Amino acid sequence: MDVNKLMAELERKHPGESEYLQAVREVLMTVEEAYNQHPEFEANRIAERIVEPDRSFTFKVVWVDDKGEVQVNTGYRVQFNNAIGPYKGGLRFHPSVNPSILKFLGFEQIFKNALTTLPMGGAKGGSDFNPKGKSDREVMRFCQAFMTELWRHIGPETDCLLYTSDAADEED
């Protein structure tokens, strides 16, 4: 594996996704020597297969706030490598959420899940929705709208959501 060549290709495909590209570079540089001792890895293009998401999608989340006003947020889900089982990963609701951050977190989730020895791939999802300052009813309506859209793309044999505290970090 030539890390620089692989990274150049990823940078071409994913311009401006600095968090994701940095995470991939760090992992590849860490495993490069061991990887190159196994020609079968290169023959099967394992590195290329693991660094690219299997699927990534964006969807609109429409919900109504307490004033009766329609709000529109963006929802995301990134799914990485389901070779050993369904995708598994959490949700993050924060204004800073973007495709690069979710690709970075989904890529890392592959390895976290592998370390548990459970047959699960990696995933991460979320939205640019900010729960801070929202009423419990607004958070509930947003979550209902989010899941109404997300459910079309996931299921028990495809993608299992994981609870994380990211969605509940209202108080700082």
Map each language-model feature to its residues.
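Flexible, glycine/charged-enriched surface loops at secondary-structure junctions
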Residues: 20-21, 37-44, 117, 154-162
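Hydrophobic alpha-helical hairpins/lids featuring a short glycine-rich hinge
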Residues: 116-161
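Single conserved hydrophobic/aromatic residue that forms the stacking wall/gate
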Residues: 163-172
